[in-house]
Amino acid sequence: MAEALLPLPRRLVVTASTPACSSASSSTSPSPHCLLSRANPRPPRLAAPSPPRHRRLKAHAAVSDKSEQPKWWEKNAGPNMIDIHSTQEFLDALRDAGDRLVIVEFYGTWCGSCRALFPRLCRTAVENPDILFLKVNFDENKPMCKRLNVKVLPYFHFYRGADGQLEAFSCSLAKFQKLKDAIAVHNTARCSIGPPVGVGDVLDSPEEKPAEASPR
């Protein structure tokens, strides 16, 4: 009875509980690593899937942040740069500008030259807070752009008070000095009286009256 109560040797327990190791190693000596792994099995690593999941979450967050960033043409330099979405908005902006110099940029979201020039234009807007910059998306305002004879992008119009349209020209990043020279010429102190001229052609033209005969 006393012998029956004695604990079995540890080696016998390991050998009995690991038949796979014994049978698999019948031709060779048993590996100590196999015995240790069977005698002391490691608990499952529950935290193992966490790193991949965290990486997926971080990747998803990075993609979400990138998708929420504004596109290049949606970035504005400040309160003196406004997006125009209709002819009425365009006319209202010119009217509300008063005697301020207004620079209108006609651009296309697909235009590589427009994109290259845009950061320089934003810096110019920051350097000239007294000038109002209007951005007109060509694809969103095709009828108005056609009436204003915009045939190439990027294209610029200069307006000021009762003087109306002062200049109209195309400009690229390589020729940006042309725009700065025009600013130096037209952004001078002045006072004007009356509504702006030169912008009425953006609306439907009134019916033309027959020309009167000139006096002989």
From Swiss-Prot:
Residues 61-188 form the Thioredoxin domain. Disulfide bonds join C111-C114. The keyword Transport applies. The active site is at C111 (nucleophile), C114 (nucleophile). It holds the Pfam family Thioredoxin. Residues 19-70 are annotated as: Disordered. Residues 1-58 form a transit peptide. It is found in: Plastid, Chloroplast. Probable thiol-disulfide oxidoreductase that may participate in various redox reactions. This is Thioredoxin-like 2, chloroplastic. It comes from Oryza sativa subsp. japonica.
